[in-house]
């Protein structure tokens, strides 16, 4: 069987995506196959090209990847309509999957393999999208100044004990918006607003990224924060003694909030069968282990060492606008 190619094309601000895949171009070039799948991907993680390269090699299918932010790719698909060359959309955050389905950008597929490999709450009930990887958004603490049991719940970040000691990423972060939308869907407006106002009463330092939050904790600028778990693992790759620890929040309650990256077949694709086969390949156990090893995300089928809060993508998606409004009202800029 001929060996497929993985080609990288940059759209807009997706430089990290292109950079991550650039090393694959030469290594897998040279296929004579006429089969090709076009992938629009918002994932920007280093070292994740291996599963795609394996698929290209195993099937002889060329993979043409076009990177950009989730919003850029959504707008591009919307503007291209039925003329889009895309076969598969790979995006981050459950909210973006929900939005793509609501806009009619995804084509439902039926696959016994996908239904078996992807848990029910991590796939669309109509088959429009499927979870690819999971990431926990949880509490981070200073390993030097905060004990493991000092804060164990999201609500606990609002304790006055943490006044002037809390760091948060900007409220414009899609990860934070999705977190709040999920709380609104599960806890209601009053309870969610009460929690956020208590957080804001602690006068948190607002920073630009999850990495900034972790480094602020390590440097002593704050003692606790909220980030996606894999950012901590990236820091530990650079410094095995990085002085920050994750706290798996709400283990005595619903469990730790998790979000997902996911993917679906683009509506109107002429390669629906091949696109479905790619998705099946990526959620198979061997490739899931590669994603976990290379980027420290969790597998969809075998997630976590902790109790995770189940995801209701549709319920949270319906509260996204309300989440943005509420965060603005409480001053989470």
List each model region and its residues.
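Ligand-binding "clamshell"
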Residues: 100-108, 120-127, 235-249
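Short beta-strand->loop
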Residues: 40-43, 125-129, 141-143, 149, ...
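Ligand-binding pocket segment of bilobal, Venus flytrap-like solute-binding proteins
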Residues: 171, 175-178, 182-249
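Periplasmic-binding protein-like
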Residues: 164-172, 281-302
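Early extracytoplasmic/lumenal segment of secretory-pathway proteins
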Residues: 24-99
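A structural signal for short loop-to-beta-strand junctions that line the ligand-binding cleft
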Residues: 84-89, 107-139, 155, 165-168
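A bilobed periplasmic-binding-protein/Venus flytrap-type ligand-binding module shared by bacterial periplasmic
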Residues: 138-145, 181, 185, 258-274, ...
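An extracytoplasmic/periplasmic, membrane-proximal ligand-sensing/linker region
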Residues: 190-192, 297-333
